[in-house]
Amino acid sequence: MDQRRLVLFLVFSLSLVMLWNAWLKQSQPAPTAVTATAGVEGAGVPTPTTGVAPGATTAVPGVPGAATASTAPRMVVRTDLMVAEVSAQGGDIVRLELAQHKATADKTKNFVLFDDGTIHLYAAQSGLIGEDLPTHKTTFALPQGEQVLKEGEDRLVVRLEAPEQDGVKVTKVMTFHRGNYLVDVAYEIVNSSERTLSPHAYYQLTRDGKPAESVEAFGVTTFTGPAFYTDAEKFQKVQFEEIAEGKAKFVKKASDGWIAMVQHYFVSAWLPQGGTEREFFAQKVGNDLYSAGVIVPVAAIQPGQSGRVEASLYAGPQEQDKLEDIAPGLDLVVDYGWLTVIAAPLFWVLSWIHGVVGNWGWAIIIVTILIKLMFFPLSAASYKSMAKMRVLGPRMQRLKELYGNDKAKMQQEMMEMYRKEKINPLGGCLPILVQIPVFISLYWVLLGSVEMRQAPWLGWIQDLSAKDPYFILPVIMGVSMLIQMKLNPTPPDPIQAKVMMAMPVIFTFMFLWFPSGLVLYWVVNNILSIAQQWQITRMIESEKSGAKPA
């Protein structure tokens, strides 16, 4: 029994080591500034496989002296949730700050999602495909001054004018909403020429291949890259390496769906209107620069007529209760790793409790109590087994003295003693075995849920997704583990006994770097386990106190 218990502890320790390594990587300093020589303007204009009008071209005409995205004039748009910088080149959103989410390294600054090269290259681009139609490389005329969503207004409409070409006038209309991370992007096309227009619209996300944060656990990296969704194929993630090697597998054509760029905690996604055929693409467009997007057809526009095409851009946090309402399957961008089947309902319960108590730390404590109650019968049986083993300690010591040189005989006598006393030798291992998947699932919930990011509990714990700044919880956890060890029967093998006593020290050291929310769960779980085990041990020892050893 002791050997099996030791093996389980070692397996659990290995799990903790892997989680610890993952958290150390996640906690590394932010990446250094991008040194790429080309910006997002290096992304090309995509080409639809069908439907381009005869004589139309997707080539972008050269514009002498045209400004790049980094040097073109910009317009700042402010809402209650975001600060966006829109470039005159293409009307692209080349920088986006999220006002309700602070930077990891400096909490006095807003988190930057789209970036123009300070740390990353990342932009939302769009345009039209067809002869002389504006693309993301066309210079638009911007409104004068900063555009601000004023008090009492629910939306802010910004109009960008493209140069008229051969009787075709195009206006890019961007609509920002109060309390929403959605931006509606429409193209209004007025055809004053003598030809029929059959254009396509494209919407793409262009970014470098560097992960926003390096996170790895159990061989699974927190995903950074494009993701496609359709009703037919559902959610498909594509690695940047697969795009570079031309091996990316995803749905190419569909009548529904969206394209997203996923990273830790945040996501951007182009959401075309439903019911129209569309083509998806992903390509490498520069040195460590990738573009993924969608192409949709625009209904033919006769001479003297006008047309309009629209898509929505979501750029914000992976708030699970809101994503599924925005678009089908958008909530799948939240990455819980290979234990999603446990982690997803665990987060749902946490979220519901948080809605009642208003604090994620207290929600974790309540969930821990509920989990403990759920496994109470199993834990009780296990602790009874360990308590009986503790009572039988003197008899086991005598067996060791009698048969110490005959391992087989000693094992035989011990098993006979277990049988007579109705003790399950594996009973003490079950609580540890059961908690491993729950422990790992909670780790992924804390790691992958933006709701936990920078969420305070009380006092010194101001971010449940970060380590305890003063290591108070890990020390309490280590002490609680030591108390638990004292309640367990002492292994007859001195080496095993020393290894078991070293576990609290080893675990405490590793837990120093774990998210404080996870340590909080483990501390509360240990305290509840100690109370339950102490009560059961006291009861068993009282029952056996008058019995004579066999």
Swiss-Prot record:
Compartments where found: Cell inner membrane
Segments traversing the membrane: 6-26, 333-353, 356-376, 430-450, 469-489, 504-524
UniProt GO molecular function: membrane insertase activity
Lipid metabolism is among the record's keywords: no
InterPro entries documented for this protein: Membr_insert_YidC, Membr_insert_YidC_N, YidC/ALB3/OXA1/COX18, YidC/Oxa/ALB_C, YidC_ALB_C, YidC_periplasmic_sf
One GO term of the biological process aspect: protein insertion into membrane
PANTHER family: CYTOCHROME C OXIDASE ASSEMBLY PROTEIN COX18, MITOCHONDRIAL, OXA1
Record note on quaternary structure: Interacts with the Sec translocase complex via SecD. Specifically interacts with transmembrane segments of nascent integral membrane proteins during membrane integration.
Protein name per the record: Membrane protein insertase YidC
Species name: Aromatoleum aromaticum (strain DSM 19018 / LMG 30748 / EbN1)
